Amino acid sequence: MDPSGSRGRPTWVLAGGLLAVALALGGRGCLGASSRPRWRPLGAQPPRDPQVAPRSGPGLRIPPGRSGAGPESSTQDLPCMIWPKVECCHFKTAVEAPLGMKLDKKMEVFIPLSTSAASSGPWAHSLFAFIPSWPKKNLFKRESPITHRLYGDISREVQGTSENGVIFQKCALVSGSSEAQTARIWLLVNNTKTTSSANLSELLLLDSIAGLTIWDSVGNRTSEGFQAFSKKFLQVGDAFAVSYAATLQAGDLGNGESLKLPAQLTFQSSSRNRTQLKVLFSITAEENVTVLPHHGLHAAGFFIAFLLSLVLTWAALFLMVRYQCLKGNMLTRHRVWQYESKLEPLPFTSADGVNEDLSLNDQMIDILSSEDPGSMLQALEELEIATLNRADADLEACRTQISKDIIALLLKNLTSSGHLSPQVERKMSAVFKKQFLLLENEIQEEYDRKMVALTAECDLETRKKMENQYQREMMAMEEAEELLKRAGERSAVECSNLLRTLHGLEQEHLRKSLALQQEEDFAKAHRQLAVFQRNELHSIFFTQIKSAIFKGELKPEAAKMLLQNYSKIQENVEELMDFFQASKRYHLSKRFGHREYLVQNLQSSETRVQGLLSTAAAQLTHLIQKHERAGYLDEDQMEMLLERAQTEVFSIKQKLDNDLKQEKKKLHQKLITKRRRELLQKHREQRREQASVGEAFRTVEDAGQYLHQKRSLMEEHGATLEELQERLDQAALDDLRTLTLSLFEKATDELRRLQNSAMTQELLKRGVPWLFLQQILEEHGKEMAARAEQLEGEERDRDQEGVQSVRQRLKDDAPEAVTEEQAELRRWEHLIFMKLCSSVFSLSEEELLRMRQEVHGCFAQMDRSLALPKIRARVLLQQFQTAWREAEFVKLDQAVAAPELQQQSKVRKSRSKSKSKGELLKKCIEDKIHLCEEQASEDLVEKVRGELLRERVQRMEAQEGGFAQSLVALQFQKASRVTETLSAYTALLSIQDLLLEELSASEMLTKSACTQILESHSRELQELERKLEDQLVQQEAAQQQQALASWQQWVADGPGILNEPGEVDSERQVSTVLHQALSKSQTLLEQHQQCLREEQQNSVVLEDLLENMEADTFATLCSQELRLASYLARMAMVPGATLRRLLSVVLPTASQPQLLALLDSATERHVDHAAESDGGAEQADVGRRRKHQSWWQALDGKLRGDLISRGLEKMLWARKRKQSILKKTCLPLRERMIFSGKGSWPHLSLEPIGELAPVPIVGAETIDLLNTGEKLFIFRNPKEPEISLHVPPRKKKNFLNAKKAMRALGMD
């Protein structure tokens, strides 16, 4: 108890007097009727006074039940009252461990809280709790049996006992008046310190809030009536508590009804299994009553209670001061020491994920020292998945750090070259750091949100599927009972037992499927966040570069050079990450292949020594039986000796099991301590080395050198760490195997000594001949030697199989093959994207930048994560196996329903007819059990590999399709804008034609005036056309000059082979010259391709500039035409409504905003022309407007008639053309289509990859369809990818011809 608590002792004592006063006043009948539910304490009995008012409304009480995980409570239990001043509370909890592990020990856990909490200690009970008129401070008491469930193999109970020390409780404190009662609810998770405690991760609290109104809560609410709280990590000895306020929604509960509000905790411990704890919490509605007061009795009770409380107060105060001061000081010192001990770091722990790596490595010792050999390989597979997930996280962190370093290095190089000032560099670096920090926070928040949502969704799906499974089981049991009504009792019992076994296996498979599906969902979420982070890093870089260009801090030429360097370095970064991933995959495959071999080796050794032990025990029994059969022992003597021998054998085996368990426990702790010490020391050494190398990285100016140093360092550290892991695994196996073999050999020797000494003496005492006994002992010795040799041979065979399996695994995951395959795919995708980009007609600088960013995003997600493919393979295998099993079950059910249809042969027909329904059902259930226990076949494994390959191909095709769609959408937007402008221009010409015709017909304009107007307008159009041609010529000349300068620069900077003299020294050998030329050819081709790409990008940008110039000119032209149309409309005095109808007729596809904008422009032209012609034009009179009003209205009809006539002419021409085409005799279209060229894309082979094949590009061609003049563009869809990277041996070719062909291919 802290000092504050000791100073508060008088307050506790004086509170007793205040309680007495409150008791007396509370009994005066102040409880009024209420129409709302009341929150009442546990154990408060309704009053039995006959003077009771009528019912005044329902109330709430907390039903009795089990507290958290503590002792059970009954209806006679006193309620737990809460004192507001108390800052600490004691929870006495008995926690049930998972899977049948019982913990009878009661733990008193001290948890300091910032708010009041429930107390189940002795001070929580009070005599006054029995008075029903105590309304103010009431407690939500929870009914919470804690149940644990592990995902995985959870249908079988684990033998033995364990203590995990995790306490999960839900409690509440009620406050407020009877009309507006509120409750403060707490959820508490305490990871207490025990011998087997472990750090918890991925904690998720799901709290039911159905029927409550919640406020002051930080949880995420779901649509299913839950709210979720999450915490990333909870260390041993720490507690995690959340609280919120709640009120009961009015009208939800009637009198006597209960509201169940359970809470569920899900977390991961060091075993990597997800554990669930569940506490029950219920609210019961109860009617409120009003007590009629008896004033005299209450007054007497008040004075008596006041005097008694005063005496007790002074007495208690004297006793506490006299006797409990020393105890309080000792308790305070103990609690301070306990709190300080909590703050001490655990041994062998470190930051940055090292502690998690150490925990994962500890699990290998747990697996090797496990007492269940059958679950070792399954646990090893789960450990491998967890390690792969951890490796993915490490690689992603490495990728992010490399990207940040590359950006900083590029800015530094730009500053050193003089293209960026140091002040701008510092400013941009600060902005990048801020953006990166915001991105990390966003990623973390999104990760937490996804994990909470996925966990809740998976839990709901699990609940639904398990309920459906239970319903199917009940239906199956009912059907079986119907079939077995006429069968015998024994047959019915056997079928019932078999059916329960089948249902258990089905539940186990269902839980495994759900766990695998949840694991896949989590892995996909991690992958999505990783890809999102990579794309956001690129987006931040490109956004900041565009911002710097816009602000003038970075010149466009420098930005272009910076982006080119960034793109080139990103290709190197992706190549480096592919190498890191392939190396990590190989090292982990080697590590777990070796671990699998170690587990099998340990199992083989245990099988051998167990076989020898069983042989020795059997020989002891055979020795007695042989003497009995020889007549040297009667039956009573044999039974007595057998009983004694079996007792000795059981005693020896029992002692062996106990010794093995105790010694393994000691060795387990010793191995973990040694392993953690060495691994942590190695991690610290590597971290110091990384820090020293990081200082050297800051002085590096070349990005290639930085990546090379990073690759060397990571490769060296990975190899060193894997070597240490392998050595520690082998050492742990040697120690455990030595311990196991020594104990088993000791037990075997004891059995042989028992046979040779004690049992021999007993037999000799009973008159057995020594020669006969000696002969049997010699035979047993030879039999034991032969058995030992046989078991050793079987062990060697299994070891050889394990070695072959490890070698095959390493061959399949060879880093060279994986890296080559990934490089080939990247080259292919690069060609695809370049081909798509080259098909674009025009792109602006900003659009080109956006396309480049999208290409980087596509290349950033071409890698394969380490964990997701393996997890996906497990899910697919489980799905295929389930589908196959369901199909077999259907066949068996059909056979039971119609047994005569199942059998084909006559013998089987007669046999099946003789069987009863019960026997058929029993055989069907046995077959189903056999199918459930059967392992996956090799065909299903191959099918899974094929499905994984198909999914990978689909992802790549989806990336290509998405990129192509973005390009097509961009070009379509440009074409759409041009089409809109052209439509508007055509509409204006139509309106001009109509207005001129009407003005000429109405003699408002003479022919000479019309000619003058048109000539003036024509001169303006010619001047506009001349300006456009001049601008086009200037742009093309500038582009040609730039291309020529670039070509000259490329030739000047080309490789030395272009600058060598034509004559070659006669003494130099031709082979040397050819070798030098061949070594420089690749550089020449790369430079040439880069020059071509730059030239193509420049031409695309130039085309965009020209299109923009033409669009601007065309817009000016439209403006001129609009000016003329508005002038003619003013002369004809066409109203605005009529002009709007005319525009809607000639522009039927235009939207309403476009028409209004065009009409507003025409109105403005009216004003302009009116201002120009104010001096010379005469104002039209009212009679003139009335005169021409009739043909104003006829304009609409005439324009519609002209458009309809033109449309009819086009329709007639199209119909005649169609009839002429149909009269011709043509070959079928399929026979006339001939595709030229052959193209296919790389085939991802399932075999080990060898020599790489060249990748041709799929082309497109145009053919004339049925000689109609229409062009049909045919894009050849490649065949299903045959991604075989094996190439047959090629013939040798002439060097010069091959070089010409390579240059021609580069030009193409």
Swiss-Prot record:
GO terms under cellular component: ciliary membrane; cilium; cytoplasm; cytoskeleton; nucleus; plasma membrane protein complex
Superkingdom of the source species: Eukaryota
Keywords: Cell membrane, Cell projection, Ciliopathy, Cilium, Coiled coil, Cytoplasm, Cytoskeleton, Disease variant, Dwarfism, Ectodermal dysplasia, Glycoprotein, Membrane, Nucleus, Signal, Transmembrane, Transmembrane helix
Chief location bin: membrane
Subcellular location as annotated: Cell membrane; Cytoplasm, Cytoskeleton, Cilium basal body; Cell projection, Cilium; Cell projection, Cilium membrane
Segments of this protein annotated with the region Disordered: 36-76, 784-816
Protein name: Limbin
Described purpose of this protein according to its UniProt entry: Component of the EvC complex that positively regulates ciliary Hedgehog (Hh) signaling. Plays a critical role in bone formation and skeletal development. May be involved in early embryonic morphogenesis.
Glycosylation sites per record: N220
Cytoplasmic compartment spans: 322-1308
Pfam families: EVC2_like
Membrane topology qualifier: Single-pass type I membrane protein
The UniProt record lists the keyword Thylakoid: no
